[in-house]
């Protein structure tokens, strides 16, 4: 008999983790309570359970909320109980659940909040897949912010999670309902919007009540745990982003072989706005990473690579691919890959694809006038040269390489502005 492999993705795995968890640091004990939810299944049965499964089907997992304990280590005071976001979700917040959430559903929302805490001044949308942003944008309206974030990478956004920093209105709900997403999370949903969103039967509609106070979390630290395969644990403080306004930028100036190298051009106000936006999105991207931003919208995001010049090139490749895909969808109502296949099978004329390709190359994948963001310093100028060739006009990076002088020289040759942050933004 044929096995229905799809069933494993719907099956809730009963976990054996305890209802209470305590972690002691010296004389301070942090106490956690496991989260479970009563959710009505498709067959009408109400099942009380925690996470559906962990990273993969079959992996038991549990979510715990911090309920007691105030930890101070040295001069660092960690987040206190009562500040829950994802970990304090209750049934009423799961407006449409469909099935119990899995680990990745909730960690996607969490990382979206991690980015949005820096971007609360304007309506902003962050779309995530596998805990990485695939599109992020700010705009004058929430609907426009979502649409820009989605178009930044339509392919990756399919089945993704969108986190929004404003209550969802009808205009935004109508736009979201046009696309297939797994999760939408927002501070609130205005009257009539939930019915619109429920047209997508499998969409998880989640309310995060404290999003309106998300800016407070910029300076709140938590204990970050990493377990090793031998059962050991590494603990670290969560990072604090020191760059919060353009006033925090550092203008590059270094000495090499007795000569002083300094950047010739400061960023314009528009460039500074994009640099700051990109640096905030960078806080949620897996390292090594390089991203390109234009008009407070991501253009290409390179994630999780082992060399910096390589990830800069991958982000360029993605920008071209995503630009061509959006162009193709606007013009023909199909994805670029669908057009590519149709041309290969002789179902559509090759000129259709050629036109898209030529227009994408002329526009340099939307990279002309964009800014370049790097979570680590450039060890050689080759990384920044990748962006310069595509027409970027400004760069933000930590600085601190022995070849900073070389990177400064590359930017000056192209009249490209550059700023240092003085702080790395690695995330693993």
Kindly label every feature range from the protein language model.
Residues 134-155, 299-380:
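Glycine- and Gly-Pro-enriched alpha-helical subdomains that act as flexible
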């Amino acid at each position: 008999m044929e096995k229905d492999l799809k069933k494993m993705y719907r099956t809730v795995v009963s976990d054996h983790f305890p209802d209470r968890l305590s972690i002691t640091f010296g004389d301070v004990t942090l106490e956690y309570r496991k989260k479970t939810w009563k959710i009505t299944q498709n067959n009408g049965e109400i099942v009380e359970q925690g996470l559906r499964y962990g990273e993969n089907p079959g992996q038991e997992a549990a979510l715990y909320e911090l309920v007691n304990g105030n930890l101070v280590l040295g001069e660092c005071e960690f987040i206190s109980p009562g500040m829950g976001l994802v970990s304090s979700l209750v049934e009423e917040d799961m407006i449409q659940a469909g099935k119990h959430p899995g680990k990745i559903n909730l960690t996607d929302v969490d990382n979206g909040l991690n980015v949005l805490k820096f971007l609360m001044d304007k309506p902003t949308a962050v779309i995530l897949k596998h805990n990485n942003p695939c599109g992020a944008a700010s705009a004058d309206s929430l609907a426009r912010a979502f649409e820009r974030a989605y178009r930044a990478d339509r392919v990756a956004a399919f089945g993704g999670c969108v986190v929004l920093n404003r209550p969802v209105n009808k205009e935004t709900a109508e736009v979201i309902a046009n696309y297939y997403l797994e999760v939408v999370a927002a501070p609130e949903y205005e009257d009539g919007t939930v019915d619109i969103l429920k047209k997508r039967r499998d969409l998880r509609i989640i309310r995060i009540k404290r999003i309106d106070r998300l800016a407070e979390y910029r300076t709140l630290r938590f204990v970050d745990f990493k377990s090793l395969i031998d059962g050991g644990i590494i603990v670290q403080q969560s990072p604090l982003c020191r760059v919060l306004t353009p006033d925090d930028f550092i203008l590059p100036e270094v000495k090499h072989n007795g000569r002083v190298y300094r950047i010739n051009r400061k960023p314009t106000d528009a460039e500074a706005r994009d640099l700051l936006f990109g640096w905030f999105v960078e806080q949620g991207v897996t390292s090594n990473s390089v991203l390109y931003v234009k008009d407070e919208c991501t253009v290409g995001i390179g994630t999780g690579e082992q060399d910096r010049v390589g990830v800069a090139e991958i982000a360029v490749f993605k920008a071209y691919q995503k630009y061509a895909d959006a162009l193709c969808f606007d013009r023909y109502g199909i994805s670029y890959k669908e057009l590519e296949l149709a041309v290969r099978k002789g179902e559509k004329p090759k000129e259709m694809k050629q036109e898209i390709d030529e227009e994408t190359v002329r526009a340099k994948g939307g990279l002309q006038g964009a800014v370049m963001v790097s979570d680590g310093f450039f060890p050689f100028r080759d990384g920044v040269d990748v962006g310069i060739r595509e027409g970027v006009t400004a760069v933000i990076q930590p600085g601190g390489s022995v070849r900073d002088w070389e990177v400064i020289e590359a930017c000056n040759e192209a009249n490209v502005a550059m700023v240092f942050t003085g702080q790395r933004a690695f995330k693993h």
